[in-house]
Amino acid sequence: SWLHITGSTDGRNGFDATPSGNPSLFGFDNANEAWFSIDNTDVNTLVAGEPYRVFVRGDRTIDVSQNSSTATATTLRATGTLATGDQTTNLANTQDNFNFIGNPYQAIVDMNLVLDNSTNLNTNQYYVWDPNMNTQGAYVTVDLSTGAPTPSGSAANQFIQPGQAAFVTTLTNADASILFEESDKATGESMTGVFRNSDQFNTSTINIDLQSQLAYANNGSMADGALLKFVANASNGIEANDAAKLGNIDETLSIVNGGHYLSIETRDLPQIGEVIPFYLSNYRQEDYVFRINLNNINGVTAYLVDEYLGTQTPLVNNEENVISFNVNEADEESVSPTRFSITFADSNLANTTIDKNSFALYPNPTNTGEFTIQLAGSSADRLDVKVFDMLGKQ
């Protein structure tokens, strides 16, 4: 099957006509980091390795005049001469610039090999768009030291697929280029569901995935995610192995370091009292869950801090921690992008576990503002208590 490529109201310039004339096929200006719409399809032709972004509504049986048309299964086809031999493309010469690149081969390719042989490109990660993430797709950062994706729910790995485009970043302010060689092909690998997940690594990490409550209940896709990697004596500043964040159409979760927004950050081992802030924006739902996996976080206890509720939730090491929260767009503090962070405390200062059946608060509700708390079996000399109403307000 084929798909509609739109960009005019009357079908000129090789486009399918739509009432709005809105474009659906785009290129990317690497030097200026800006998308631009393709101006025609009757003169321009596809070139192996040249990347595009295309909105896929479905195959050509759908009605493009209706926004509510149901999507259909679509197969993209291209014809032409196969690209063989070395394929080199010059890229932006500005440090940290995102460069849109395409796999020129009709074969799976190992991006570790590609970037190792390229010039002045960051070899630590690359970025792909996964249409299976969230409801409209989301950017995924692949850590090339492990092949692991962030968010972790993606099937993306270090192997770029035939026909797939991706982003890489320029390392320093100097000439940069990407080189694909025949020896980069990974013919023994299987296709991923992005267009097999790698084994998870065994270092100290905190993987934070965001999911709507509905998607969580129905085993759906992640909305977005971020990854913290902890390595002894690593720098807490911004370096090449820290992956900048690409913003999504919908929910976007970033790690904040100074003025930098990251999808992966490599840091020194966590210290007591250290705070790592997050930036979470573009809420599309009201009810969410964080799925936070800690691996080998030793010597400290990590807490998820919720500034809106005034809570600190301890995170269990080497387990998945599922934490529900909700937002209300009418409440600015509720949807504040800086609402959440992670902090660390001495793991020896463990909180006493309280059986909820031994706890009572009455009268509830109270009309006088006074109430009694009863806690059976507690030997504590002093207790600090925070009380919240049904809306989550303290």
Predicted regions and their residues:
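Compositionally biased Ser/Thr/Gly- and acidic/asparagine-rich
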Residues: S1-Q394
